[in-house]
Amino acid sequence: IYPADIESFTVLKNASETALYGSRGASGVIQVKTKKGTGKGFQISYEGNYGIEAMYKSMEMLNAAEYIAAAQKYGLEYNNKGYDTNFRKAITRTGNIQNHYLAFSGGTPQSNYRASFGYIDHNTIIRSKGYRNLVAKIDVTQKAFGDKLTGDFGVFGSSFKNNDIFDSQMLFYSADAMNPTYPYDKLNGSWVKNGAASQVNPPGAVLKERDDTKNMNFNAHLKLNYDMTNSLSVSAFGAYSYA
C-alpha cells in the first residue's frame, strides 16, 4: 500500500474484533483503511519529491604512494601493481530517491470512484544497489435500492524490484583492506571472488555477487452490504489474491 493511500489504521486486539480473521488474527490485527471516492465531483492530486543522499563521513585511506611509503618505512613486504585505486570511491556513488503519486476521484454520493498510482525509485550510495516500487489502486462504490444496497469493488496491484548485493559488510571491509596499487578490474576481465576467503575479496567481485528479488502482487475484492432495517444488515465479501 502506498503511504498516501492510507486514511487511517486501527489495532484490533479483542477476541470479538479479531474473530472475523480466524486463526490468523490470534495475535491481533492491524486494520488499514484506505482512501475512497468522496462523491464531491472530480478531484485530482499529485505529490512528488526528489532527494540526494551521500556518505556523511568516510575513512581516509592511504593512496598508492602513501601505502608504499608506509610499507617501506616499517619494513613490510608489499606488492606494487602500478595503480592508484580508491576502492571506497569505486564502489560508492551519490545516491538519489524520487517519489511520485497521482490520484483522482469523482462521482456522486451514490456512485463514485477513486484511482491512484504511486512510484518509488531509489538508487543507494552503493553502486548497483537500489529498488523500484510501482503501486496502482482503483476503488468503485455503488449504492442502489434507495441506498439500502452498497457495493464496494476494489483492485490493487504492485510490482517491487530490489537490486541488491549479497554481502554489503564484506564489500566495505574488502574495499578498505585492499591494496591501492591493484586495479579495480583486471585488464582482461573482472576479478573472481575467492570462496575460501571469509572477509577480504576483490571489491568488484563482491559487488557483482547479486541477491536481486522481484515481487508482483494483485488483489481484487468485492463487498456487498444490504440494510434490512436500521439495526440489521447483511454483508457478503469475496476476494482474490495473487503473489
Residue ranges and their predicted role:
Residues I1-K13:
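Short acidic/polar hinge/loop motifs at secondary-structure boundaries
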Residues Y2-A4, Y21-A26, R93, K129-R132, ...:
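Short, glycine-/polar-rich solvent-exposed loops and beta-turns at beta-strand/coil boundaries
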Residues L12, K33-K35, A103-G107, S116, ...:
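Transmembrane beta-barrel domains of outer membrane proteins
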Residues L12-A15, R24-G28, N96, G130-V135, ...:
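Short, glycine/acidic-rich beta->alpha junctions
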Residues S16-E17, D84:
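Residues that cap or anchor secondary-structure elements
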Residues A19, G25-G48, H100-A103:
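N-terminal periplasmic accessory domains that precede
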Residues T38-D84, I125-R127, V135-N219, S235-A243:
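Surface-exposed loop/interface segments of Gram-negative outer-membrane beta-barrel transport/assembly proteins
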Residues R93-S111, G118-D121, P203-Y242:
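Outer-membrane beta-barrel transmembrane strands
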